[in-house]
Amino acid sequence: MSSVTTSGATRSTFSFARIWDQFGMLVVFAVLFIGCVIFVPNFASFVNMKGLGLAISMSEMVACGMLFCLASGDFDLSVASVIACAGVTTAVVINLSESLWLGIAAGLLLGALSGLVNGFVIARLKINSLITTLATMQIVRGLAYIISDGKAVGIEDERFFTLGYANWFGLPAPIWLTVACLVVFGLLLNKTTFGRNTLAIGGNEEAARLAGVPVVRTKIIIFVLSGLVSAAAGIILASRMTSGQPMTSIGYELIVISACVLGGVSLKGGIGKISYVVAGILILGTVENAMNLLNISPFSQYVVRGVILLAAVIFDRYKQKAKRAA
């Protein structure tokens, strides 16, 4: 009887731990959201909800690529620079060629090439991803300043602004594009061999290699995807700002990484789900939105974001220790 009771308790504990691991941060977001609805003036208004959706849409998109980088055990610190440079490149090419599609293609190509360089250096040359992407972050940001001559590049073709300001079924186009991105990357991670290979590499790269996983090719594709979604976010941002801004999104990479880790993506690699990314971004976005509505100074917001990042890293460390102990 005692053994049956113990077994049942073990199953119950295990089941709760697994449910918390899967949905815990979404529960935290739900509690936070309800608290903001009750205590923050105008938080629940439709205008603010739409603004919140727009504010986090770019973060969600970039975080999709970062999810794969972190799940494979790497980082991509160049995402913010790619956002800026892709926007500038798109603006310059549109103005020179008078072609929207050529401009968008140029911006996406910039992101893909940046990711290709990152992936090749990290996977083929075996250089640490932190150092590699720190270098490309500087290079790509410098290119953005060179291309734009250090100034905002106004876009002359007003048709381009439709991408950022169009409404589809009552919601801004960037929100729908972000939802599509989340669905695609969620399926890619959970339902494809490429996704399983990504998690296997993050769990144990050498074991994955011995098992026949094409580690080099997979890592290169991961960074190309990260570059592409960052470039897409930069193009949408340029459309909303009606110009390419070389100085935009500075420090944005840390926000995206902290959101991923806060949601449950492991810094050690091998663990990650699209729901973790959604939860992390929603929590960070809601906190920032609430602070703005409460007129909390931008300087204090830096402190809050830093505390959240530190808490996320400590929590990740605690989870890793708990799993090893189990």
Where are these regions (language model features)?
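Single transmembrane alpha-helix segments in multi-pass membrane proteins
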Residues: V31-L96, V121-K126, G264-I274, V307
